[in-house]
Regions:
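Alpha-helical transmembrane segments and immediately membrane-proximal extracytoplasmic
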Residues: 1-439
Length: 439
């Protein structure tokens, strides 16, 4: 008799009325004296502390490298710093098989078989993510954070002997813990447990684990003094909401969809270029470093994740003008594609937000009568939904960053819903055209 069968036989399923989930071992037995949710709590704390420490090191070293007076006064220093870290990224990928963003995303891995997560690459994940970010590449920290958190859960699950069927609880707990701490919302990634798993039994286990882990991560970061992304852009709209905003936010959501489609086209172009470097990972990373360096010498505000740079743009968008802001958005997305397709490790969230906000600011300069938070909320939510395919998570993220009240939250929901309805038709048209092309 297997362990799973033994646990099922010892479980009072008729008392709970939920025999399927109980049969998976979510009880205390003689063979397993610790309840699974004790492990969920432990890995949530471990994940939050580890990710907070990783972020602290990143921010301190990044400040030392890039935010000193000498570097800011001498743009020619950009390649001096960027290229060695780009070389390190290439070496780690080629000779140590460090994780990259060339395959599936973190959300893709969560919706698949989490038991396939390779915890032995945790040290490489830590170093590769740091090197990618220190290079100035247009990539956010969330990709590295997700990898670190998930691998901590996988390591804990294997060493403690957690049954395979329960390890998804640990992974969702640590992921939610890390991301909720980063965003500073107790609910943000808790919805991952509801949106990503397709198996109802898996969803029934991961949802509570996500909520528990997310709350713990939020509290750990809060206790450490992290403000996260609350009121991230510090907007102060002075116009009242108008009935026309209901229609406008739908248009802005669809504009975000267009921006996401442009992003996809840029990714395909970057893939065509950097795909020629298969087996030459070092040269591929160095080429990307040269591109980043060239842009950094001319326009350093377009490099890095954009997490802090966008706040400077929001502070004085008129200094750039509509045309330049649109150009900045496109260049940012192109550089994001370069980073992803050349083997750098990170996430797309902050660069995508940078681009969406730049487009919104450009439109606000042209149409100053429209509330800026409606513009940003619609475009940002529309583009991020196409990116993540997780509507509740996107709504929560956008609402947190804009410090949205009920009115703006309702408008954000409309923008996301409009994109959800429209996107399948666009994908069907694209698929039809591809099928019609001669082989």
């Amino acid at each position: 008799m297997s362990d799973r069968d033994g646990d099922a036989a010892a479980t009072p399923v008729d008392v709970t009325g939920s025999g399927d989930d109980r049969a998976l071992g979510e009880t205390v037995t003689a063979a397993r004296p610790v309840h699974p949710y004790v492990h969920v709590v432990i890995v949530a704390v471990l994940g939050a502390v580890a990710v907070f420490a990783w972020l602290w090191v990143y921010e301190e070293v990044n400040r030392l490298l890039w935010e000193n007076a000498f570097v800011t006064a001498n743009p020619w220093m950009f390649p001096v710093i960027c290229l060695p870290f780009s070389l390190l990224v290439g070496l780690l990928v080629k000779y140590r098989h460090a994780p990259t963003m060339l395959g599936e995303s973190m959300l893709d891995s969560l919706s698949g078989d989490v038991s396939a997560i390779k915890w032995r690459t945790l040290p490489l994940n830590v170093v590769a993510a740091w090197a990618s970010l220190f290079s100035g590449a247009v990539i956010g920290p969330e990709g590295g954070i997700g990898g670190i958190a998930s691998k901590i859960a996988a390591l804990y699950g294997e060493k403690v002997g957690i049954p395979i069927e329960l390890r998804s609880m640990l992974v969702f707990s640590t992921i939610s813990s890390a991301y909720n701490g980063l965003v500073a919302s107790p609910l943000f990634s808790g919805v991952l447990g509801a949106e990503l798993p397709t198996d109802p039994k898996v969803k029934a286990r991961t949802m509570p684990a996500s909520l528990v882990g997310g709350a713990i991560g939020y509290l750990v970061f809060f206790a450490a003094g992290s403000s996260g992304l609350q009121n991230y852009l510090h907007l102060s709209p002075d116009q009242p909401y108008k009935p026309v905003d209901v229609l406008l936010v739908v248009v802005f959501g669809l504009l975000g969809l267009v921006l996401a489609l442009v992003t996809g086209a840029l990714f395909r172009a970057a893939s065509a270029v950097f795909g020629r470097f298969e087996g030459r990972e070092v040269e591929r990373a160095l080429l990307a470093g040269v591109i980043f360096s060239a842009v950094g010498v001319v326009a350093p505000i377009l490099l890095f994740s954009g997490e802090t740079q966008i706040q400077a743009v929001v502070g004085n968008p008129a200094a750039y003008g509509p045309a330049v802001l649109i150009g900045m958005a496109l260049v940012k997305l192109a550089l994001l594609a370069v980073a992803f397709k050349s083997g750098f490790l990170g996430g797309p969230t902050f660069p995508a937000i940078f681009a969406a906000v730049c487009v919104a600011l450009a439109l606000n300069l042209l149409f100053p009568g429209i509330r800026i938070d409606v513009l940003i909320g619609g475009i940002m939510a529309g583009s991020l939904f196409v990116l993540f395919k997780a509507p509740l998570m996107v709504i929560l993220l956008t609402a947190v960053m804009l410090q949205a009240g009920p009115e703006l939250t309702a408008l954000i929901v409309l923008a996301v819903t409009a994109v959800m309805i429209t996107l399948p038709y666009i994908l069907a048209v694209v698929a039809g055209r591809q099928a019609a092309r001669p082989a």
